[in-house]
Amino acid sequence: MSKIKVLIVDDSAFMRKVLEDILKSDDEIEVVATAKDGKEAFELVKKLEPNVITMDVEMPIMNGIDATKQIMAYKPTPILMLSAVTKQGSEATLKALDNGAVDFIEKPSGSVSLDIRKIGEKIIKQVKDASKSKVRIKSSRILENIKKEKQDESSTPKPQVEKTSGLSPEKLNDTAILIGSSTGGPPVVSSIISNIPKNTPPIFIVQHMPKGFTRVFAERMNNNSAITVKEAEHGEIVKPDHAYVAPGDSQMVLQKRGGNVYIIIDENMPKIHGTKPTVDVTAEYVTKYYGKNTIGVLLTGIGRDGANGLKMVKNKGGYTIAQNQDTCVIYGMPKTAIEMNVVDKVMDPIDIPLEIIKFAKKIGG
C-alpha cells in the first residue's frame, strides 16, 4: 500500500519540524517536502503532487487562503488549515474552507512545543481522513453557488430577502429543522442557511467544530441570511426564524417548560462518536419535543454521527434528508444513514432549502 504523501506549509521552521516529526512517526505517511510560504507551496504542488497539504493561514509572500485558491484552481488537493483559536484565525480558516480546504487543525495555545505533540494522534488521523476526501471543486454545484453568493454580497450586512416560506404562523413553533455536519460541512451549511426564507421554524445546527470557531461560523452565516443565525446560548428560548449553532466542546440539548422550549448547553456531557457537539445527542431532544414535525438533514462528514439521529426522526414520523455522494467531501455520515434505511430523500445540497420548506408546509398546512 502506497504511503500518503504530505506537504507541510508553515512560515515557522519550528512548526514545520514538529509537524514533520509527528507525521513521520506514522508508517502510512510520508512527508515529501516542507514550504515556508504559499508561493513555494504552489511550486512544490506542481512538482510533487502531494496527497494532502497542511497549510498555515498567516504567512509572508503568499498567505494560506491565497495559496489554497491557487492550488484548488490548478489541481484540487485535500488541504488541512493550521488555525489559531482566535476570532481572526477562525474567520481566516472559514474563508479557506469556503475556497476548498477540507478541514482544519486547531493550532494549540500556550506552550506550542508541548501542546502540538499532545494532539499528534489527532493530526495524524485528520491527515488520513483528508487523504480519503473528495475535492473535485470544479464539479461541485454547491461551491459554485457559494462563490456566486460571495460575489453578490453588498456592503449591507444582512440582505433584504423578500420571500417567505408561506408557513402558517401558529405552526412555526411546533416544527423544527435539525442539520448535522462534519468534514467539508461549513460551506455547505452556509449555503443552505443563506437560502432559507423568513417565516421558518427554528433550525438546530450541529457542526463538528471546536470552541471559538462555532461563534465565528454563526456570525458569518448571520451576515448572509434572511433569518437570525447565532451560536446557541444556555437558557435561551427557542424561536422561529432563528438558527442555533451548537457551541464547540459542548452538547446542545433542549428542555421544555410551560409552552416554551429552552436551549441547554452542557459542557460536562461526554463526547459521543469521539466528538462534541454530537448530532445524535441534539437529535434525541429535538425529536422528543417536536416529534413527527422534525426535519432531519445530514451532510458530509466522516464517521457515523447523525445516522442514529435520523433514525430517531424517522421513528417519530418526521422527514429525513441526506447529502448525495457526488457532492460530499467525505461520504461517511450520510452513507451510514442511507445504509440504515433511515433516509427519505438523497439530494444535492443546493436543492435542500426548497425541500425543507416543501415538507414544512406539509406539516404547517
UniProtKB/Swiss-Prot annotation:
CDD domains named among the record's database cross-references: CheB_Rec, REC_CheB-like
GO term, biological process aspect, one: chemotaxis
Comp. bias regions, Polar residues: 156-167
Q: Which key words are in the record?
A: Chemotaxis, Cytoplasm, Hydrolase, Phosphoprotein
**Residues annotated as region Disordered?**
146-167
Q: Name one GO cellular component term.
A: cytoplasm
What's the short name of a Pfam family annotated to this entry? CheB_methylest
Location comes to: Cytoplasm
Q: Where is the composition biased (Basic and acidic residues)?
A: 146-155
Q: Which residues carry this modification: 4-aspartylphosphate?
A: 56
EC number(s) in its UniProt entry? Answer: 3.1.1.61, 3.5.1.44
What does the UniProt record tell us about how this protein is modified after translation? Phosphorylated by CheA. Phosphorylation of the N-terminal regulatory domain activates the methylesterase activity.
The domain comment in this protein's record states: Contains a C-terminal catalytic domain, and an N-terminal region which modulates catalytic activity.
Q: What does this protein do?
A: Involved in chemotaxis. Part of a chemotaxis signal transduction system that modulates chemotaxis in response to various stimuli. Catalyzes the demethylation of specific methylglutamate residues introduced into the chemoreceptors (methyl-accepting chemotaxis proteins or MCP) by CheR. Also mediates the irreversible deamidation of specific glutamine residues to glutamic acid.
Protein's UniProt name: Protein-glutamate methylesterase/protein-glutamine glutaminase
> Corresponding gene?
cheB
